[in-house]
Curated annotation (Swiss-Prot):
Catalytic site positions: H38, H150
Name recorded for this polypeptide: Non-secretory ribonuclease
Lineage, uppermost ranks: Eukaryota, Metazoa, Chordata, Craniata, Vertebrata
EC number: 4.6.1.18
Localization (cell): Lysosome; Cytoplasmic granule
Subunit and interaction comment: Interacts with and forms a tight 1:1 complex with RNH1. Dimerization of two such complexes may occur.
Gene from which the chain derives: Rnase2
Length: 155
């Protein structure tokens, strides 16, 4: 009885540790996720290369993704623009840019089982964008009281 009780307690402890670890992974900082998925403030990237970083944390290749060629600080400034309704029509924490930026649109053309080997079509453009913003979390830098958490669209 003693070893089984010890095993069950050990299993319970390991399970609790796993749940807490997964919870912390699930509570990924949304602003960091936004930065990884949507900010590319250099020259136009090749989607095959930059999507490897985005897909690294996903179970399958992302079908489409848009990169804004601007700085995170410039997107944070857009969070200070007047609130507008988001595309899903239920949230009102979106903000539209007042200036156009270069964007790169990545469209999945060849999915694979290994997410880092997916192939994408790369298209460049110049557009305005709309982002959803939220108050920063304790994990965010205190430099910004409000941070972008979702790219709601380009227009």
């Amino acid at each position: 009885m003693g070893p089984k009780l010890l095993e069950s307690r050990l299993c319970l402890l390991l399970l609790l540790g796993l749940v807490l670890m997964l919870a912390s992974c699930q509570a990924q900082i949304l602003s960091q996720k936004f930065y990884t998925q949507h900010i590319y403030n250099s020259t136009y990237p090749r989607c095959d290369a930059v999507m490897r970083v985005v897909n690294r944390y996903r179970p399958r290749c992302k079908d489409i993704n848009t990169f804004l060629h601007t700085s995170f600080a410039d997107v944070v400034a857009v969070c200070g623009h007047p609130n507008i309704t988001c595309n899903n029509l239920t949230r009102k924490n979106c903000h539209a840019s007042s200036f156009q930026v270069f964007i790169t649109f990545c469209n999945l053309t060849m999915p694979t089982r290994i997410c880092t080997q997916c192939r994408y079509q790369t298209t460049g453009s110049v557009k305005y964008y709309r982002v959803a913003c939220e108050n920063r979390t304790p994990q965010d830098t205190p430099m910004y009281p409000v941070v972008p958490v979702h790219l709601d669209g380009t227009f």
